[in-house]
Amino acid sequence: MERLSSNNRAAPKRRIAFGKRLFGLAFGLLLATALAVQVKAASKKDSDAESKATPTPTATPPNFKPESTTTTGSVTVEGSPIEYQAVAGTLVVHPKGWDDAASAEDWKSKESKEREASEERAEKPQTEEGEEKSKNPTAEASMFYVAYNKQHAEPDKRPVTFLFNGGPGSSTVWLHMGAFGPRRVITADNSHTPAAPYQVVNNDYSLLDASDLVFVDAPGTGFSRIAGKDKEKEFYGVDPDAHAFAEFIVAYLTKYGRWNSPKYLFGESYGTPRSAVLVNMLQHDYDLDLNGVMMLSQILNFDLSVDRPENNPGIELPYILALPTYAASAWYHHKLPGPNSPAALEPFLKEVEQFAMNDYAHALAEGATLPKPDRQAIAEKLHTYTGLPVSYILKANLRIDGGEFAKNLQDATDMTTGRLDTRFSGPTIDPLSKEAKYDPQAAAISSAYVSAFNDYVRKALHYGQDKTYRPGLRLWKTWNFQHQLPGETRPSHQATNTMPDLASAMKYNPELRILLAGGYFDLATPYYEGWYEMHHLPIPERLQDHIEYHYYQSGHMVYAHQESLKAIHDDAAAFIHSTDHLGK
């Protein structure tokens, strides 16, 4: 039998020892793995618990980003050439309650959040999933503008004017292409403008000779857009709309270094109550005084509107203040009775104003107690001033609203009179209707303005190739007309009235100057209504001297009449030169 050497006898013992070590290593590894799994599970459980106790903030990404294109051009204003830079673009604004500091807070890292006190975290609003909500409103507006700046001018020595139309729900295409931009679309003076091609020409009456110009589209109109939760609520209303414009103006002044420029507002139609709220807001809330505010076709107190005042019985002023416009319209269309029609309009209107504020106002104030003979006498006098039949006036109880007047002034020839401009007429749509079914002036010129701007903004300003321009939105049903008056803590439930805002702004800044402009043939916002509002502002008598008045033989869009365009340009330019503190 073979004998084993000593080495051979030791090998089995070494193998047994190695096996024991290998088993121990494997067991240890298995145990470590199990422990690691348990630790990881416990860690995940703790992490989940911590996640629920310490929510991670959900930051709200922006809906929009600012953008712009820049071009250059030249305009000749009353014989003087002006080189300008044009910027077409957008700025992002947020609703009231938005705070950039809170926005930065929303974007903090988790580690930074974990260092905050737990009681502070517990107070923050939670979502159903336990995530922390953003402190800020999520709605945003991207507001479109076109700015024209005179080349090589020092900003501190150059006024800047922010212009906007009204609606509510209107873009600013009208002021831009009809009034003060460097290019102007040609439309017929008092009749329907033929279809395209439209003629766009150098604007001899651009306001660039007096001021840099920023045409701004309200949120949701033109190329402006809104987005986010409750977007309509956050931007479609008297107060949120004015706040958006205030935020836009502040952002514009900052972006383009215009804080030390003389500053103006120019608002038309609903742009006038917007201006009243806006100037007061800028001066009180932003410490930003303005040099002046220009109001075109003003309505500050909606109780004075001649659009269906019969729905507000007992309020007689709309009929009284509209009467001079009825008389001017009858004069223009040769509807005044008798052979001796007044040769000049203004003296005739002074006579009508006196009758309106005295005999007519007293008669309406008497209501049902007005004696029949007096009622008959007032009806005959109204016939003299309006051309409407005495029988119709008596049937209307001496009270005729704007739509009824537009339908009946030229009813004998089945023609409807314009609302925005009574110089315009168009075929009556429904001869049996009580009031006008459309506005012949709007129908006559809207296509020219919208078509011309859509062509101009893309070809000349190189903006909007992939976007839709919205000239107007129907917002009357969704617009929040409640307004929080200065000094009040909650919105008023009365009809919108921004006269207190304008008065507050004038008292807060007693150097503020106001220009009121209106057209004699404006049936939407009768000129005498604006006069009445200004003379009833709750301001000291000396501040009344800070308001100047200009009236033209045109309508709501005064500039649609070329002679009136020149006149309003000259008046606005003189107003700016007299208030810009540049010592010219």
Tell me what each language-model feature is.
Residues 267-280:
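Glycine-rich nucleophile elbow surrounding the catalytic serine of serine-hydrolase chemistry
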Residues 553-564:
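Catalytic histidine-centered segment of alpha/beta-hydrolase-like enzymes
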Residues 182-186, 279, 283-384:
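A catalytic-pocket lid/entrance helix-loop region that shapes and gates access to the active site
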Residues 363-524:
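Alpha/beta-hydrolase fold catalytic core
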Residues 258-269:
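Alpha/beta-hydrolase fold nucleophile elbow
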Residues 208-211, 218, 235-254:
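Alpha/beta-hydrolase active-site loop
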Residues 512, 526-536:
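Short alpha-helix in the alpha/beta-hydrolase fold that links the catalytic acid
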Residues 42-57, 98-234, 535:
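N-terminal cap/lid subdomain of alpha/beta-hydrolase-fold enzymes
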